[in-house]
Every structure is written in C-alpha cells, then in structure tokens.
From Swiss-Prot:
Function, as annotated: With S4 and S5 plays an important role in translational accuracy. Interacts with and stabilizes bases of the 16S rRNA that are involved in tRNA selection in the A site and with the mRNA backbone. Located at the interface of the 30S and 50S subunits, it traverses the body of the 30S subunit contacting proteins on the other side and probably holding the rRNA structure together. The combined cluster of proteins S8, S12 and S17 appears to hold together the shoulder and platform of the 30S subunit.
PANTHER family with a match to the protein in the record: 30S RIBOSOMAL PROTEIN S12 FAMILY MEMBER (PTHR11652)
Record protein name field: Small ribosomal subunit protein uS12
Entries under NCBIfam families matching the protein: rpsL_bact (TIGR00981)
Organism whose genome encodes this protein: Rubrobacter xylanophilus (strain DSM 9941 / JCM 11954 / NBRC 16129 / PRD-1)
Keywords from the named record: Methylation, Ribonucleoprotein, Ribosomal protein, RNA-binding, rRNA-binding, tRNA-binding
Family, as annotated: Belongs to the universal ribosomal protein uS12 family.
Chain residue ranges for the region called Disordered: 1-45
UniProt subunit comment: Part of the 30S ribosomal subunit. Contacts proteins S8 and S17. May interact with IF1 in the 30S initiation complex.
Top-rank lineage group of the source organism: Bacteria
GO terms for biological process, alphabetical: translation
UniProt entry tagged with the keyword RNA-binding: yes
Encoding gene (name): rpsL
Modified residues (3-methylthioaspartic acid): D89
Amino acid sequence: MPTTNQLVRKERKRQTKKTATPALQGSPQRRGVCTRVSTTTPKKPNSALRKIARVRLTNGHEVTAYVPGEGHNLQEHSVVLVRGGRVKDLPGVRYKVVRGALDALGVEGRKQGRSKYGTKKS
C-alpha cells in the first residue's frame, strides 16, 4: 500500500482495456473483400470442416472471418460485412461474416433464428 506522499509524487497507473476485435477499430461492423474462402478443422475434441474467409477490410486490416450457417455463396472478391465474435474451437478466428448483408446471402430454408442468418420470412 503506497503512502499519500508516494501517490502525490506518482499517481496510479490506469489499467488499459484490451479490445477483443482490434481490426474493427471501435466500429460495430466493417466492410471488406474476400481474398480467400476455404475450410479448416476445429480444435480437439470437435471434428468438422468449418467455413472461413480471409477478408481485407476497408481500413487495410486482413482478418480471418467465420461464415456461419449451412452453405454459402462466398468466393474470392465477394464484398462482405464483418462483425466481431470469436469461434471458440477455431484458433485465430475472432470475426464473423454477417449473413444477408452485401454479397453474403442468407441461409436457405432457415425457419428458426432467422435474424442471425439473414433469412427472410417465408
């Protein structure tokens, strides 16, 4: 515990908050262009082929974004909207593609939880 005199001489250091999504630079979402669309395998104990896209954002950052939902229409040069949100079993994936915005179509045949996958009411 510092003395009052020590605090007068040198005040306490403020703790800096570390952001989970630095590439968005405080924005809720950012637009970007897909540079690569591929699949990757998750960490143990899970097993799947998770769809990911490498996206160059408008601010120059290049990020890896997860493409949620079943099936997608993304390919190289597709313009997508990227939001924050990590995928726990994919190391290094801290962003998600917003379905139903720009070139990323909504999930076909989705009945429940449609707003998260950009599906219109059918």
